[in-house]
Amino acid sequence: MMSCLVPTRFTLTLNTACLLTSTWGFVRATSVVLPPSLSKAGHKQFLTIISIIATIINNAVNISNYYIQRNNKMNLETKKKSDFISRHVTLPVSLVLESIVATVYWPLRLFFVNLIMHGVESTAKTPFPMTVDMAIHLYPILYLLADHYLSGSGTKFKLSNKHAWLIVTSLAFSYFQYLAFLIDAGQGQAYPYPFLDVNEPYKSIIFVVVATITWAYYVFYQKFPPKYIKKSAKKGDKN
């Protein structure tokens, strides 16, 4: 029976740093006063907030896994479960979420800010400073990529592309229904991002496109796993 890959100190450092910056960014971002059209649904409607919560959970789980794998009193089954949850559930989920957040957010933030923020026509008038912007929209994906590819703890994810597609599709549909439940256009409420304030079928098409790109990120990460995993596979083929 194969033993679990013991997380490196670099993984611990990355997850601790990400936990601190993400939590700080989350607190600062959720303290921003929303305009009337968004205030009723609150900050919980934003994909950025949902993603940063997933990242914070992933950080906490991976920090715990670091110590679990080094605890001689823990049995192998507990270590295997901890490894699976931290490296093959919370990490890929937060990684693909932060990937799509960064992909959608930054091009619009830099060139079409009116499509990503309500009532903002200039990048100089955003509701929070660049430090907060980076903490919730850029640093998370950089930390997660470093943990997966550079920390020495990364492996190819165990979830198949087919199962990943089912999960991503379910999450996208759930978010679509979640927003429909929170937002009542008849009462002057608006979707969290202006580019979603369109009629059907365009709104659904946007969700399908975003969900497809999110799944494509998972496929990409599986196609190009951490390098040392590839080397190990090649050695195994020769034997």
Curated annotation (Swiss-Prot):
Statement: the UniProt record of this protein carries the keyword Cell membrane: no
Swiss-Prot/TrEMBL keywords: Endoplasmic reticulum, Membrane, Transmembrane, Transmembrane helix
InterPro entries: ADTRP_AIG1 (IPR006838)
Membrane topology: Multi-pass membrane protein
Subcellular location(s) per record: Endoplasmic reticulum membrane
Keyword Repeat: no
Chain ranges passing through the membrane: 12-31, 46-66, 100-120, 126-146, 163-183, 205-225
Topological domain ranges for the Lumenal compartment: 32-45, 121-125, 184-204
Any GO CC annotation of this UniProt entry: endomembrane system
Family: Belongs to the UPF0641 family.
Name of this protein: UPF0641 membrane protein YHR140W
